[in-house]
Regions:
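Charged, low-complexity surface segments at secondary-structure and domain boundaries
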Residues: 2-11, 49-53, 69-76, 136-150, ...
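Luminal/periplasmic acceptor-recognition loop/helix of membrane-associated glycosyltransferases
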Residues: 52-91
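Residues that form generic nucleotide/phosphate-binding pockets
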Residues: 23-26, 66-69, 153
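Flexible, solvent-exposed extracytoplasmic
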Residues: 87, 92, 98-200
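Active-site-proximal structural scaffolding
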Residues: 13-17, 27, 80-81, 89-90, ...
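Short alpha-helical segments and helix-capping/turn motifs at coil-helix boundaries
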Residues: 15-26, 79-84, 101-104, 111-112
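Extracytoplasmic
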Residues: 1-54, 126
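Positions that flank functional sites
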Residues: 41, 59, 103
Length: 200
């Protein structure tokens, strides 16, 4: 689940991994993903939680196409920047974990959607106030063509608001949803993202 420590960059690897095993019992129960900030890879595995920051030698083709479609680099490492705030709500990230030494850096870089939750087991934990539970439902849809016309940097915002259907699927299933009005495809700001998360 880990890797061999390297003398300078990984000197605290064992400590972080064993602390994560303790933190596993102190995290709130529930089905959610976690995110990490400037700590070692794959901490989520020790927590039995899916984690946005991940290193693995295999990845499903759908993941390798999903992330780049949102303007996020994805190869064997998943490491979306904090500036991709809408990705956290879209992928149901409820908690972010960092070390006390990195707290100030995180708070300076993060958007307003994070609140300090607690410190325990050598970690500082933040709660995503824009958390959207897994399995949320949609009221709106847009077509694949409309989706692809949107700037990559705002597509995660759009996916919080509407489901993407191929033209063929829209002809069959579009009757169950409302076609997203053109004006709502352009209001893709942080404030509108917060409202969209509340509506989910």
């Amino acid at each position: 689940i880990g890797k061999f420590g390297q003398w300078y960059t990984d000197s605290d690897l064992v400590k972080q991994d064993t602390s994560a095993l303790l933190l596993k019992n102190d995290l709130p129960e529930g089905d959610y993903r976690v995110d990490t900030y400037k700590i070692h890879d794959n901490i989520g595995m020790w927590l039995d939680k899916s984690c946005l920051q991940y290193f693995g030698s295999t990845a499903a083709p759908s993941i390798l196409s999903f992330y780049p479609a949102l303007g996020v680099k994805r190869d064997v490492r998943s490491e979306p920047e904090l500036s991709n705030y809408a990705l956290r709500g879209l992928l149901s990230v409820e908690y972010l974990i960092t070390t006390p030494e990195k707290q100030t850096d995180f708070e300076n870089e993060a958007d307003d959607g994070w609140e300090y939750a607690f410190a325990k087991d050598g970690y500082a934990v933040y709660r995503n106030t824009n958390y959207v539970p897994m399995g949320f439902a949609y009221d709106y849809y847009l077509t694949q063509t409309e989706y692809e016309e949107t700037a990559k940097a705002t597509r995660a915002n759009l996916l919080i608001r509407a489901l993407v259907l191929t033209d063929e699927d829209a002809a069959v299933y579009g009757k169950y949803l409302t076609h997203l009005p053109e004006g709502r495809r352009e209001e893709l700001y942080y404030e509108s993202y917060v409202q969209d998360c509340r509506e989910r």
